[in-house]
Swiss-Prot record:
Family: Belongs to the anthranilate phosphoribosyltransferase family.
Binding positions (anthranilate 1): 81, 112
Keyword Transferase carried by entry: yes
UniProt cross-references to Pfam families, sorted A to Z: Glycos_trans_3N, Glycos_transf_3
Naturally occurring in which organism (per UniProt): Haemophilus influenzae (strain PittGG)
Role noted for this protein: Catalyzes the transfer of the phosphoribosyl group of 5-phosphorylribose-1-pyrophosphate (PRPP) to anthranilate to yield N-(5'-phosphoribosyl)-anthranilate (PRA).
NCBIfam families: trpD (TIGR01245)
Protein name in the entry: Anthranilate phosphoribosyltransferase
Pathways involved: Amino-acid biosynthesis; L-tryptophan biosynthesis; L-tryptophan from chorismate: step 2/5
Cellular component aspect of the GO annotation: cytosol
Length: 333
């Protein structure tokens, strides 16, 4: 079907199948649509709310057009959020990825520049001295040798440049805000995915099933796209094609409730200071606890099922300063 027919289908309020969505997003990523067509399409999908098939199709097109990453055959994970929760916190997922790697897990973190906060994953890593523009081969080498690598979205999904001016002009959430975590070019075995709105938990979970994720968690923590300690975290666990929904409280991690305010971050330089202190075992207790809770859930994907024990192990590990050594090694690639 031609793009125009697919667009017409959207304009008339009809949804697209996965294959139709893949075809349309292929056209977008390959620069075959005008800015006006892209804008109209994004708004049509926003007004009706994109369904699982449409999101899965957009993910498929993104991965088909992505720069290739030499995928390892050992199990590895991604921990990544949509961003856009408007909370301006420290970089929790980035810290958790480094901590988990220094404890023996393998993490290929997909990330980008800031969406709505002052400091996205690549912003803070750059401030920490990490080269976010390494080649896929160098990134793979880091994953092999130190257990963690960072895949900069703009480097792998260059076709998204066709959408950038439209997204900037629209100034509103679109389907592209929810694609990021789902389009890691390394195609991880496991995923811990944070979403900025509670209603996205179900959408994401169903999309993860459609994408045949082996084992994933989708989380929304009382306004955060992370596991929260200031309130409840809504969770969807996707395993072998089935979804289980539940909530987690700070008590489930053996931790006390703490304020969201205690996680406020700042510019990349400020967040880099917070992360350095944390990884050296000298950070704020609230930062350590939040990263421990998120890392604990990430480790569960690797078969470490006891969240409270995981938290204790992470907190002890942070005090050892070994996580900072992993960060220092990451800066050498």
């Amino acid at each position: 079907m031609q793009h125009n027919q697919l667009l017409e289908q959207l304009y008339s309020g009809h949804s697209l199948s996965t294959s139709e969505s893949t075809a349309l997003f292929n056209a977008v990523i390959q620069g075959e649509l005008s800015n006006e067509q892209i804008a109209a399409m994004l708004i049509a999908l926003k007004v009706r709310e994109a369904n699982t098939e449409e999101i899965a199709g957009a993910v498929a097109a993104s991965l088909q057009n992505a720069k290739v990453f030499p995928r390892p055959d050992y199990p590895f994970a991604d921990i990544v959020g949509t961003g856009g929760d408007g909370q301006n916190t420290i970089n929790i997922s980035t810290a958790s990825a480094i901590v988990a790697a220094s404890m023996g897990a393998k993490v290929a973190k997909h990330g980008n520049r800031s969406v709505s906060s002052k400091s996205g994953a690549s912003d803070v890593l750059t401030a920490l001295g990490v080269n976010v523009n390494v080649t896929p081969e160098q990134a793979r080498q880091a994953l092999d040798e130190i257990g963690v690598c960072f895949l900069f979205a703009q480097q792998y999904h260059s076709g998204f440049r066709h959408v950038a001016p439209v997204r900037a002009a629209l100034k509103t959430h679109t389907i592209f805000n929810i694609l990021g975590p789902l389009i890691n070019p390394a195609r991880p075995t496991y995923h811990l995915l944070g979403v900025y709105a509670p209603e996205l938990v179900k959408t994401y979970a169903e999309t993860a099933v459609a994408l045949e994720h082996q084992h994933s968690f989708v989380v929304h923590g009382s306004g955060l796209d992370e596991v929260a300690l200031h309130g409840e975290t809504q969770v969807a666990e996707i395993k072998n094609g089935k979804i289980e929904y539940f909530t987690l409280t700070p008590e489930d991690f053996g931790l006390k409730t703490q304020s969201l305010e205690s996680l406020r971050g700042g510019e990349p330089q400020k967040n880099a200071q917070y992360l350095t202190a944390l990884l050296q075992g000298k950070g704020k207790a609230e930062h350590a606890n939040t990263v421990a809770a998120n890392t604990a859930l990430l480790l569960k994907l690797f078969g470490y099922d006891d969240l409270k024990q995981n938290v204790q192990n992470v907190l002890a590990h942070l005090l050892s300063g070994k996580a900072f050594e992993t960060l220092q090694k990451l800066t050498t690639y």
